[in-house]
Amino acid sequence: MDKCPSDQQQTDTNRSIVAHPWRHDPEPTSRPAVTALSEEELALKEHVSAFAKEVIGPKVREMDDKGVMDPEIIAACFEMGIMGIEAPVEYGGVGLGFTAACVVIEEIAKVDPAVAVMVDIHNTLNITAFNRYATTEQKEKYFPRLCKSALSSFCLSESGSGSDAFALKTKAEWDEASQEWVLNGTKSWISNSKEAEIFIIFANTDFSEAHKGITAFIVDKSNPGIAVGAKEDKLGIRASSTCEVTLENCRVSKDAMLGKRGQGYKMAIELLNEGRIGIGAQMVGLALGAFENTLPYLHERKQFGRSVADFQGMQFQYARALMEIEAAKVLVYNAARLKEAKAPFVMEAAMAKLKATEVAQSTASQCIDWLGGIGFTKGMPAEKYYRDSKIGTIYEGTSNIQLVTIAKQIQAGYRV
């Protein structure tokens, strides 16, 4: 019979947990597993899974070879309603939660991580930014487009500001005569930029205030002061466009400011913390896609008169691989649920992205090993998953930045 701790022991246990602010839920709860989906989320998962396989699947190889996102795929994503997951229904959105967005990203990433990151950035960064910081007038103006047809881009990074993202040089100056903001600078490594119609631009309105001068602006593609450069020829997620975005005397009205002046730093930090969960979902989907595309071959392939999947040495490997994928998925959905519950989630988001990225890389690599020589060719999807997985260690905070974030959160719990 299990021994129950005394009241004093229980009190001591609770006290030790509460003492560290990075521990969030010390009390036992009756909630289901964090990966358990609501009826709405489950229906969405099944719907998106079928869409990804039937609509995106046939075009994956061609888009990867050409390094171009098929416009029909972008249009289909809007038609499906998955480009406004968290946008309010009254503006044309779906009105679901953040976890639903993660479900969509994961399911698409199983088929093509490049399409998944397009959907991810549009939803977890840009739709969230408009949800949280846009005025009523801005929501009325932009949400119908963002939900129905206009792809968006999040323009923070610059060539001289990588992990130190807020060392940006793009400036915004107020022109009293015309009553406009004038933006000048160059953004680098901007996802979705080739196809985007709406850009969120981060610029500094006063360099003497350092990061406190950073402000976000909404810029439309039709603005003559914005230009998108050539598409980068990347190792992976090749269909996802990555370009320079140049602002040259780009004039916008005062109504184009997203949020308040000087709020850009806080805005970007918040959005990137949430966006990391979306990247975690992408990496979990990638790992599952590689795994699920490889396992049938292991059962079909015969060596020494037996299915390769029947060899114990192989069983140990794919059993451990799926265990790691499930562990990463739990971290991702735990972070998503915490974010939805408005609980602290910064450390959990960093853990989720880091773990999911590591698992995606290791799973994709193992899948090539399991397939043997054929896995090293473009005849099997494993090599694409392998190439696509690498970006997870780089964008929306490198793996080392995630470790720094986790360490800072832990330290905060022990400071006197």
Regions found by a protein language model. Give the residues of each.
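Alpha-helical interface subdomain recognition
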Residues: 2-121, 133-138, 149, 176-177, ...
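Short Ser/Thr-interspersed hydrophobic loop/turn segments at strand-loop and sheet-helix junctions
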Residues: 81, 105-109, 203, 219-224, ...
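Short Gly/Pro-enriched turn/cap motifs at secondary-structure boundaries
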Residues: 119, 160-163, 189-192, 206-208, ...
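Flexible, glycine-rich active-site loops centered on histidine and acidic residues
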Residues: 127-133, 154, 208
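A short, Trp-centered hydrophobic/proline-enriched beta-strand micro-motif
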Residues: 148-157
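Flexible, small-/acidic-enriched active-site or ligand-binding loops
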Residues: 167-169, 222-253
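A short core secondary-structure module
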Residues: 180-228
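Long, acidic (Asp/Glu-rich), low-complexity accessory segments flanking structured domains
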Residues: 249-267
